[in-house]
Amino acid sequence: MRTQKATSVFVACTAAFLAACSPVQGGEEPSFSALSYKNLIPNESYSPATAPLAPGTALDLSGDEPQPGAYFNYQSCTAAWSFTLADARTIAVTASHCGKPGDKVWAGTADGDFSYPAEPIGEVIYSDFYAEDSHDLDVAFIEITGSADYYVPGAVDNSVATSLAHLPLHVCKLGRVTDETCGTLIHGAAMAQLNSGGLQRDSIAARARVCSTNGDSGGPVYGEVEGKQTIVGVVSGTTQRLEEGHTCETTQTDMELSFTLATDIQVLAKEVLGPMA
């Protein structure tokens, strides 16, 4: 079997396509807009009692079935966090542009190559960009039905924001390719346009000056909230692509990262999946 990664694993969001993607001008303070659902004031978070996948787990997603001797196209992405529903289903969170409902999900590897033969560990059951009533959020939910040896590039506390007075001014992200990278917040939630291959969608996202690349999509974005490391978002896209052969450590860039807010995702999860355990 020959494998081929999709060429648009990680979405690029450029200032040419959307004014909201433009960085804050010199001398301006980051502006914290109200969250897309409601203005949430207290800082609150929760830690799922049962989490099948650790934040930062590598995932491979595809609508195709791998066959010996045939090309296999798949999306290389990362999980942000996971949780259990009241009906005992276990769910992982990633980016919507990583997969459509019905796509199968496999455990990813450290080198990014698809491990064959392998059994799927789950299936995408909701992807907001493909929903009839989209909420303009780059988020997908995966029902986990199997297990495997998972690759996780680092450790992040599985504490997820449910409400925030404002986002942390300094955030980090964990992705399967570039591991942990950190930087300063540029602005809070605003409408942006995501472009990935033939997919163009409006999306509500915050922005930070953080380096990332293909395969990191869907990973956790986190920062310190009241002295505690807390996941505040999910990696969505960047203003620039990391050139082949370059790394975040060796490349000086003005790259900016867009991320979907965890608070919005929590509201959406309850709406489309039901109550959590």
Where in this protein do the model-derived segments appear?
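Active-site region of chymotrypsin-like
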Residues: 67-77, 149-155, 180-277
